[in-house]
């Protein structure tokens, strides 16, 4: 029987996606996220009984490594990278790292138990790929395999990106998804009526994972996934460009985004911590965009910009 090594990192909720990425980069074969907010949000939804869970801003991210992995080296690297994230201004909280060994079937049971279907927006619900789910009339279901470690789509930055897509897509658009990760924003765009979606990620693992998640969802063969460094070398114009990545990276793509977004089109930027907000706004305004919508959840911000000559109801530019 193959055995696995489990490493659990306790961090602030705002660091969920960044820390998950760190764990995958150190060789984890999957992650599971335990968040008290998920339990509290589910409580009383259908009258089920849930254990009492104390609300906390700290979450537990558990990563699974093959038995051959040198955990001492992995944990040292994790601690170094978490310290670096904190130096960038990301709130990571008081970090603790635990580890243990477990059998393969225990891993399969452990990481799946954390995930439940989650209604994210008015129309969109994210459902784990192994779950049978009966959608209501008009409900659009995104199937994801969270075991692939790019998150379940419930992080505030992803939620706000999905809200923004729901706000701007009317059907028939061309969408570019920069830093696609799990592919959730591309899948949502397809379900919301976009005609063609181009999804790019610098990470080859993300490209593979995104394609696997896309394949789980029917009617998404209009999504084209490829490796790419932001928007470098892209010539395809788009009605909507969406990027849910760190603010320091977002500012590197705004000029290219302005070049590619069609007139009256939109640029959706998410993944912005509050202290980086002004930097992103100034960069987008300098590129020529006008701000149409500003969303906030906790320390995270998402912005919807428009490329337009009609500046009524918009800000900046």
UniProtKB/Swiss-Prot annotation:
It is found in: Cytoplasm. S-adenosyl-L-methionine binds at residues 158, 179, 201, 244. Its EC number is 2.1.1.-. One of its GO terms (molecular function) is protein-lysine N-methyltransferase activity. Keywords: Cytoplasm, Methyltransferase, S-adenosyl-L-methionine, Transferase. Disulfide bonds: none annotated. It catalyses: L-lysyl-[protein] + 3 S-adenosyl-L-methionine = N(6),N(6),N(6)-trimethyl-L-lysyl-[protein] + 3 S-adenosyl-L-homocysteine + 3 H(+). Its main location: cytoplasm. InterPro entries: Ribosomal_L11_MeTrfase_PrmA, Ribosomal_PrmA_MeTrfase, SAM-dependent_MTases_sf. GO terms for cellular component: cytoplasm. It comes from the Bacteria. NCBIfam families: prmA (TIGR00406). Methylates ribosomal protein L11. PANTHER family: ELECTRON TRANSFER FLAVOPROTEIN BETA SUBUNIT LYSINE METHYLTRANSFERASE. Belongs to the methyltransferase superfamily. PrmA family. This is Ribosomal protein L11 methyltransferase. It comes from Streptococcus pyogenes serotype M12 (strain MGAS2096). The gene is prmA.
């Amino acid at each position: 029987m193959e055995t696995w090594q489990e490493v659990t990192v306790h961090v602030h909720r705002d660091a969920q996606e960044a820390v998950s990425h760190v764990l995958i980069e150190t060789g984890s074969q999957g992650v599971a996220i335990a968040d008290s907010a998920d339990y509290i949000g589910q409580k009383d939804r259908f009258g089920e009984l849930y254990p009492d869970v104390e609300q906390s801003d700290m979450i537990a991210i558990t990563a699974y490594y093959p038995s051959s992995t040198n955990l001492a080296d992995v944990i040292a690297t994790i601690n170094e990278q978490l310290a670096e994230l904190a130096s960038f201004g990301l709130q990571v909280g008081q970090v603790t790292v635990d580890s243990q060994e477990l059998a393969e079937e225990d891993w399969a049971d452990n990481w799946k138990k954390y995930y439940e279907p989650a209604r994210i927006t008015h129309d969109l619900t994210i459902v784990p790929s192994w779950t049978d789910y009966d959608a209501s009339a008009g409900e659009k279901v995104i199937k994801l395999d969270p075991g692939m470690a790019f998150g379940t789509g419930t992080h505030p930055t992803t939620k706000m990106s999905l809200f923004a897509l729901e706000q701007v897509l009317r059907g028939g658009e061309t969408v570019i998804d920069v830093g696609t990760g799990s592919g959730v924003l591309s899948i949502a765009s397809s379900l919301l009526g976009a005609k063609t979606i181009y999804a790019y990620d610098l990470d080859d693992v993300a490209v593979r994972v995104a394609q696997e998640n896309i394949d789980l969802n029917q009617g998404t063969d209009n999504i084209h996934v490829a490796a790419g460094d932001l928007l470098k070398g892209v010539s395809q114009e788009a009605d909507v460009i969406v990027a849910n990545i760190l603010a320091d990276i977002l500012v590197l793509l705004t000029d290219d985004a302005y070049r590619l977004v069609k007139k009256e089109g939109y640029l959706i930027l998410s993944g912005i911590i509050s202290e980086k907000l002004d930097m992103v706004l100034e960069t987008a305004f300098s590129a020529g965009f006008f701000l149409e919508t500003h969303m906030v959840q906790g320390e995270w911000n998402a912005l919807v910009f428009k490329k337009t000559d009609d500046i009524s109801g918009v800000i900046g530019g």
